[in-house]
Amino acid sequence: MKVLSKLKPAPGLWLHKAPTPKPGRDEVLIKIKKTAICGTDLHIYKWDEWAQKTIPVPMHVGHEFVGEIVEVGEAASALAVGDRVSGEGHITCGDCRNCRAGKRHLCRYTVGVGVNRPGAFAEYLVIPAKNAYKIPAKISDDIAAILDPFGNAAHSALEFDLVGEDVLITGAGPVGLMSAAIARHVGARHVVITDVNDYRLALAEKVGVTAAVNSTKTPLTETMKNLGMTEGFDVGLEMSGNAEAFRSMLTVMNNGGKIAFLGIPPEPFAIDWNQVVFKSLLIKGIYGRRMFETWYKMTNLLLSGLDISPIITHEFPMKDFQQAFDVMLSGKTGKVILNWEQ
Protein backbone atom coordinates (compact mmCIF):
# COMPACT_ATOMS: atom_id res chain seq x y z
CA MET A 1 0.00 0.00 0.00
CA LYS A 2 0.98 3.65 -0.41
CA VAL A 3 1.94 5.43 2.80
CA LEU A 4 2.98 8.95 3.77
CA SER A 5 5.64 8.69 6.47
CA LYS A 6 8.37 10.37 8.45
CA LEU A 7 11.24 8.21 7.19
CA LYS A 8 14.18 10.15 8.58
CA PRO A 9 14.80 12.74 11.31
CA ALA A 10 14.58 15.79 9.06
CA PRO A 11 11.92 18.18 7.74
CA GLY A 12 9.47 16.69 5.24
CA LEU A 13 7.37 13.58 4.65
CA TRP A 14 7.92 10.81 2.14
CA LEU A 15 5.47 8.81 0.01
CA HIS A 16 6.46 5.15 -0.24
CA LYS A 17 5.18 1.58 -0.31
CA ALA A 18 4.61 -0.52 2.82
CA PRO A 19 2.94 -3.87 3.58
CA THR A 20 -0.82 -3.74 4.11
CA PRO A 21 -1.48 -4.40 7.83
CA LYS A 22 -3.65 -7.25 9.12
CA PRO A 23 -6.21 -6.63 11.87
CA GLY A 24 -6.02 -8.53 15.15
CA ARG A 25 -9.03 -10.26 16.70
CA ASP A 26 -10.42 -7.05 18.23
CA GLU A 27 -9.35 -4.71 15.41
CA VAL A 28 -10.65 -3.55 12.03
CA LEU A 29 -8.89 -2.83 8.74
CA ILE A 30 -10.08 0.42 7.15
CA LYS A 31 -9.59 1.44 3.51
CA ILE A 32 -8.94 5.17 3.70
CA LYS A 33 -11.07 7.51 1.60
CA LYS A 34 -9.97 10.94 2.80
CA THR A 35 -7.69 12.38 5.45
CA ALA A 36 -7.19 15.88 6.82
CA ILE A 37 -3.97 17.60 7.81
CA CYS A 38 -3.72 18.55 11.48
CA GLY A 39 -1.46 21.00 13.27
CA THR A 40 0.23 17.96 14.80
CA ASP A 41 1.10 16.77 11.29
CA LEU A 42 2.68 20.16 10.61
CA HIS A 43 4.87 19.80 13.71
CA ILE A 44 5.95 16.38 12.44
CA TYR A 45 6.51 17.70 8.91
CA LYS A 46 8.68 20.59 10.16
CA TRP A 47 10.49 18.25 12.58
CA ASP A 48 10.40 20.79 15.37
CA GLU A 49 11.54 20.27 18.95
CA TRP A 50 8.28 18.59 19.99
CA ALA A 51 8.39 16.19 17.04
CA GLN A 52 12.03 15.31 17.67
CA LYS A 53 11.20 14.35 21.27
CA THR A 54 7.96 12.53 20.47
CA ILE A 55 7.91 10.79 17.07
CA PRO A 56 9.73 7.50 16.51
CA VAL A 57 11.27 7.20 13.04
CA PRO A 58 10.07 5.68 10.76
CA MET A 59 6.37 6.39 11.40
CA HIS A 60 3.25 6.47 9.22
CA VAL A 61 1.64 9.76 10.25
CA GLY A 62 -1.89 11.25 10.17
CA HIS A 63 -4.91 10.71 12.41
CA GLU A 64 -7.88 12.55 10.86
CA PHE A 65 -9.68 10.26 8.43
CA VAL A 66 -12.77 8.65 6.98
CA GLY A 67 -12.82 5.26 5.33
CA GLU A 68 -14.60 1.96 4.84
CA ILE A 69 -14.09 -1.22 6.85
CA VAL A 70 -12.77 -4.00 4.61
CA GLU A 71 -11.85 -6.60 7.23
CA VAL A 72 -13.08 -7.27 10.76
CA GLY A 73 -11.34 -9.18 13.53
CA GLU A 74 -13.19 -12.16 14.97
CA ALA A 75 -13.96 -10.35 18.26
CA ALA A 76 -15.13 -7.11 16.62
CA SER A 77 -18.75 -8.18 16.25
CA ALA A 78 -20.31 -4.69 16.50
CA LEU A 79 -18.86 -3.66 13.12
CA ALA A 80 -19.13 -5.09 9.62
CA VAL A 81 -17.35 -4.96 6.30
CA GLY A 82 -18.72 -1.99 4.37
CA ASP A 83 -19.30 0.25 7.41
CA ARG A 84 -18.17 3.84 6.77
CA VAL A 85 -16.18 5.01 9.77
CA SER A 86 -13.96 7.64 11.25
CA GLY A 87 -12.11 6.88 14.44
CA GLU A 88 -10.92 8.06 17.82
CA GLY A 89 -7.17 8.59 17.44
CA HIS A 90 -6.38 8.14 21.13
CA ILE A 91 -5.82 4.46 21.89
CA THR A 92 -6.29 3.89 25.62
CA CYS A 93 -5.22 1.05 27.90
CA GLY A 94 -8.67 0.06 29.21
CA ASP A 95 -7.24 -1.01 32.58
CA CYS A 96 -6.22 2.14 34.48
CA ARG A 97 -8.49 3.82 37.02
CA ASN A 98 -9.85 6.38 34.57
CA CYS A 99 -10.48 3.88 31.78
CA ARG A 100 -12.32 1.54 34.15
CA ALA A 101 -14.39 4.50 35.38
CA GLY A 102 -15.48 5.31 31.81
CA LYS A 103 -13.16 8.32 31.49
CA ARG A 104 -10.94 7.04 28.70
CA HIS A 105 -9.97 10.56 27.60
CA LEU A 106 -8.01 10.80 30.87
CA CYS A 107 -6.01 7.58 30.37
CA ARG A 108 -2.40 8.08 31.47
CA TYR A 109 -1.21 5.50 28.95
CA THR A 110 -2.80 6.93 25.79
CA VAL A 111 -1.12 6.08 22.49
CA GLY A 112 -1.76 8.32 19.49
CA VAL A 113 -2.57 7.10 15.97
CA GLY A 114 0.01 8.64 13.64
CA VAL A 115 2.13 9.71 16.61
CA ASN A 116 3.09 6.58 18.57
CA ARG A 117 1.60 3.94 16.26
CA PRO A 118 1.02 3.73 12.47
CA GLY A 119 -1.31 6.45 11.24
CA ALA A 120 -4.00 7.22 8.70
CA PHE A 121 -1.93 8.78 5.89
CA ALA A 122 -2.03 5.41 4.17
CA GLU A 123 -4.30 3.41 1.90
CA TYR A 124 -5.17 1.15 4.84
CA LEU A 125 -5.30 1.64 8.61
CA VAL A 126 -5.73 -0.79 11.51
CA ILE A 127 -7.26 0.46 14.76
CA PRO A 128 -9.07 -1.23 17.65
CA ALA A 129 -12.72 -1.83 16.82
CA LYS A 130 -13.73 0.10 19.95
CA ASN A 131 -12.07 3.19 18.45
CA ALA A 132 -13.95 3.07 15.14
CA TYR A 133 -17.05 5.26 14.87
CA LYS A 134 -19.78 4.61 12.29
CA ILE A 135 -20.76 7.69 10.28
CA PRO A 136 -24.43 8.48 9.52
CA ALA A 137 -25.20 8.63 5.80
CA LYS A 138 -26.17 12.32 5.97
CA ILE A 139 -22.63 13.33 6.98
CA SER A 140 -20.32 13.79 3.98
CA ASP A 141 -16.87 12.24 3.64
CA ASP A 142 -15.26 15.68 3.87
CA ILE A 143 -16.94 16.42 7.21
CA ALA A 144 -16.34 12.88 8.48
CA ALA A 145 -12.62 13.35 7.78
CA ILE A 146 -12.45 16.25 10.25
CA LEU A 147 -14.46 14.76 13.11
CA ASP A 148 -11.30 14.41 15.21
CA PRO A 149 -10.62 18.19 15.43
CA PHE A 150 -14.34 18.90 15.46
CA GLY A 151 -14.41 16.73 18.57
CA ASN A 152 -11.76 18.92 20.18
CA ALA A 153 -13.96 21.92 19.43
CA ALA A 154 -17.11 20.23 20.75
CA HIS A 155 -15.38 19.02 23.92
CA SER A 156 -14.16 22.57 24.60
CA ALA A 157 -17.26 24.52 23.59
CA LEU A 158 -19.71 22.24 25.39
CA GLU A 159 -17.71 22.12 28.62
CA PHE A 160 -19.78 25.04 29.94
CA ASP A 161 -23.35 26.27 29.37
CA LEU A 162 -23.31 28.69 26.42
CA VAL A 163 -27.01 29.50 26.06
CA GLY A 164 -27.46 33.26 26.25
CA GLU A 165 -23.83 33.77 27.23
CA ASP A 166 -21.16 36.07 25.80
CA VAL A 167 -18.31 33.92 24.49
CA LEU A 168 -14.74 34.93 23.65
CA ILE A 169 -12.59 32.62 21.53
CA THR A 170 -8.87 33.32 21.21
CA GLY A 171 -7.44 31.71 18.08
CA ALA A 172 -9.21 31.40 14.71
CA GLY A 173 -7.54 28.20 13.59
CA PRO A 174 -9.85 25.38 12.46
CA VAL A 175 -10.69 24.26 16.02
CA GLY A 176 -11.39 27.83 17.11
CA LEU A 177 -13.61 28.35 14.07
CA MET A 178 -15.53 25.14 14.75
CA SER A 179 -15.93 26.16 18.40
CA ALA A 180 -17.39 29.47 17.25
CA ALA A 181 -19.86 27.67 14.98
CA ILE A 182 -20.95 25.43 17.86
CA ALA A 183 -21.38 28.38 20.23
CA ARG A 184 -23.61 30.12 17.71
CA HIS A 185 -25.60 26.96 16.99
CA VAL A 186 -26.39 26.22 20.64
CA GLY A 187 -27.56 29.73 21.48
CA ALA A 188 -24.73 31.94 22.71
CA ARG A 189 -25.60 35.66 22.67
CA HIS A 190 -22.36 37.19 21.39
CA VAL A 191 -19.53 35.11 19.92
CA VAL A 192 -16.32 37.09 19.50
CA ILE A 193 -13.16 35.55 18.04
CA THR A 194 -9.67 37.05 17.97
CA ASP A 195 -6.60 36.32 15.86
CA VAL A 196 -3.86 38.12 13.92
CA ASN A 197 -4.54 36.24 10.65
CA ASP A 198 -7.01 38.15 8.47
CA TYR A 199 -7.60 35.14 6.19
CA ARG A 200 -8.87 33.08 9.11
CA LEU A 201 -10.86 35.97 10.54
CA ALA A 202 -12.66 36.12 7.19
CA LEU A 203 -13.50 32.41 7.60
CA ALA A 204 -14.87 33.24 11.04
CA GLU A 205 -17.36 35.61 9.44
CA LYS A 206 -18.60 32.68 7.33
CA VAL A 207 -19.43 30.59 10.40
CA GLY A 208 -21.53 33.39 11.89
CA VAL A 209 -19.48 35.02 14.64
CA THR A 210 -20.76 38.28 16.07
CA ALA A 211 -17.34 39.87 15.65
CA ALA A 212 -14.00 38.72 14.21
CA VAL A 213 -11.30 40.88 15.73
CA ASN A 214 -7.70 41.35 14.63
CA SER A 215 -6.12 41.84 18.03
CA THR A 216 -3.23 43.87 16.58
CA LYS A 217 -5.65 46.45 15.19
CA THR A 218 -8.73 46.64 17.43
CA PRO A 219 -8.85 46.53 21.25
CA LEU A 220 -11.30 43.99 22.64
CA THR A 221 -12.75 46.68 24.88
CA GLU A 222 -13.78 48.63 21.77
CA THR A 223 -15.58 45.59 20.35
CA MET A 224 -17.33 45.00 23.68
CA LYS A 225 -18.50 48.61 23.78
CA ASN A 226 -19.84 48.37 20.22
CA LEU A 227 -21.82 45.26 21.20
CA GLY A 228 -23.31 46.95 24.24
CA MET A 229 -21.51 44.66 26.68
CA THR A 230 -21.37 46.32 30.09
CA GLU A 231 -19.63 43.59 32.10
CA GLY A 232 -17.38 40.92 30.59
CA PHE A 233 -17.33 37.61 28.77
CA ASP A 234 -19.05 34.73 30.55
CA VAL A 235 -17.16 31.95 28.78
CA GLY A 236 -13.69 31.93 27.24
CA LEU A 237 -12.37 29.30 24.84
CA GLU A 238 -8.57 29.51 24.52
CA MET A 239 -7.53 27.86 21.25
CA SER A 240 -4.29 29.65 20.34
CA GLY A 241 -1.72 28.65 22.92
CA ASN A 242 -0.55 32.25 22.71
CA ALA A 243 0.49 33.85 26.00
CA GLU A 244 -0.59 37.38 25.11
CA ALA A 245 -3.97 36.17 23.84
CA PHE A 246 -4.65 34.38 27.13
CA ARG A 247 -3.50 37.33 29.23
CA SER A 248 -5.85 39.55 27.23
CA MET A 249 -8.71 37.09 27.75
CA LEU A 250 -8.25 37.21 31.52
CA THR A 251 -8.66 41.01 31.55
CA VAL A 252 -12.06 40.93 29.81
CA MET A 253 -13.67 37.97 31.59
CA ASN A 254 -16.67 38.65 33.80
CA ASN A 255 -16.50 37.81 37.50
CA GLY A 256 -17.26 34.11 37.85
CA GLY A 257 -16.32 33.50 34.22
CA LYS A 258 -15.32 30.08 32.94
CA ILE A 259 -12.46 29.28 30.56
CA ALA A 260 -11.82 26.08 28.59
CA PHE A 261 -8.14 25.94 27.65
CA LEU A 262 -7.28 23.75 24.63
CA GLY A 263 -4.39 25.70 23.05
CA ILE A 264 -0.91 24.32 23.69
CA PRO A 265 1.64 27.00 24.59
CA PRO A 266 5.11 26.44 23.09
CA GLU A 267 6.67 27.28 26.45
CA PRO A 268 5.60 28.18 30.01
CA PHE A 269 4.43 31.75 30.59
CA ALA A 270 3.34 33.97 33.47
CA ILE A 271 -0.15 35.42 33.97
CA ASP A 272 -1.68 37.93 36.36
CA TRP A 273 -3.11 35.57 38.97
CA ASN A 274 -4.96 38.48 40.57
CA GLN A 275 -7.29 38.33 37.56
CA VAL A 276 -8.03 34.69 38.32
CA VAL A 277 -8.38 35.01 42.08
CA PHE A 278 -10.36 38.23 42.43
CA LYS A 279 -12.68 37.37 39.54
CA SER A 280 -13.12 33.80 40.83
CA LEU A 281 -12.40 32.45 37.35
CA LEU A 282 -12.65 28.74 36.58
CA ILE A 283 -10.00 27.48 34.13
CA LYS A 284 -10.43 23.95 32.76
CA GLY A 285 -7.78 22.19 30.68
CA ILE A 286 -9.18 20.26 27.70
CA TYR A 287 -7.51 17.34 25.93
CA GLY A 288 -8.93 15.24 23.13
CA ARG A 289 -12.54 14.10 23.16
CA ARG A 290 -14.72 12.36 25.74
CA MET A 291 -15.07 8.77 24.53
CA PHE A 292 -17.60 8.59 23.13
CA GLU A 293 -19.94 11.19 24.55
CA THR A 294 -18.28 13.95 22.51
CA TRP A 295 -18.70 11.87 19.35
CA TYR A 296 -22.43 11.44 19.99
CA LYS A 297 -22.87 15.15 20.64
CA MET A 298 -20.91 16.37 17.64
CA THR A 299 -22.64 13.91 15.31
CA ASN A 300 -26.02 15.19 16.39
CA LEU A 301 -24.92 18.82 16.15
CA LEU A 302 -24.23 18.11 12.48
CA LEU A 303 -27.49 16.21 11.97
CA SER A 304 -29.41 19.10 13.56
CA GLY A 305 -28.10 21.54 10.96
CA LEU A 306 -24.73 22.82 12.16
CA ASP A 307 -22.67 23.67 9.06
CA ILE A 308 -18.89 23.57 9.42
CA SER A 309 -18.18 23.13 5.70
CA PRO A 310 -16.82 26.71 5.25
CA ILE A 311 -13.86 25.66 7.40
CA ILE A 312 -12.71 23.20 4.69
CA THR A 313 -10.89 25.38 2.16
CA HIS A 314 -8.66 23.06 0.09
CA GLU A 315 -8.61 19.48 -1.21
CA PHE A 316 -5.78 17.70 -3.03
CA PRO A 317 -5.20 14.22 -4.43
CA MET A 318 -2.95 12.26 -2.10
CA LYS A 319 -0.10 12.34 -4.65
CA ASP A 320 -0.03 16.15 -4.34
CA PHE A 321 0.62 16.02 -0.59
CA GLN A 322 3.59 18.38 -0.91
CA GLN A 323 1.37 21.08 -2.38
CA ALA A 324 -1.14 20.50 0.41
CA PHE A 325 1.51 20.94 3.10
CA ASP A 326 2.90 24.03 1.36
CA VAL A 327 -0.57 25.59 1.44
CA MET A 328 -0.96 24.67 5.11
CA LEU A 329 2.39 26.23 5.94
CA SER A 330 1.31 29.48 4.26
CA GLY A 331 -1.26 30.06 7.01
CA LYS A 332 -3.92 30.95 4.45
CA THR A 333 -6.12 27.89 4.85
CA GLY A 334 -8.79 26.34 6.95
CA LYS A 335 -8.82 22.54 6.90
CA VAL A 336 -6.97 20.82 4.05
CA ILE A 337 -8.18 17.43 2.78
CA LEU A 338 -6.12 14.71 1.08
CA ASN A 339 -8.13 12.41 -1.21
CA TRP A 340 -6.76 8.85 -1.18
CA GLU A 341 -9.12 7.65 -3.93
CA GLN A 342 -7.77 9.99 -6.62
From Swiss-Prot:
It holds the Pfam family ADH_zinc_N. Zn(2+) 2 binds at C93, C96, C99, C107. NAD(+) binds at V175, D195, R200, L262, G263, I264, I286, Y287. Keywords: Cytoplasm, Metal-binding, NAD, Oxidoreductase, Zinc. Its main location: cytoplasm. Its EC number is 1.1.1.103. It catalyses: L-threonine + NAD(+) = (2S)-2-amino-3-oxobutanoate + NADH + H(+). GO terms for cellular component: cytoplasm. NCBIfam families: PRK05396.1, tdh. Homotetramer. Catalyzes the NAD(+)-dependent oxidation of L-threonine to 2-amino-3-ketobutyrate. This is L-threonine 3-dehydrogenase. It comes from Coxiella burnetii (strain RSA 493 / Nine Mile phase I). The lineage of its organism: Bacteria, Pseudomonadati, Pseudomonadota, Gammaproteobacteria, Legionellales. The gene is tdh.
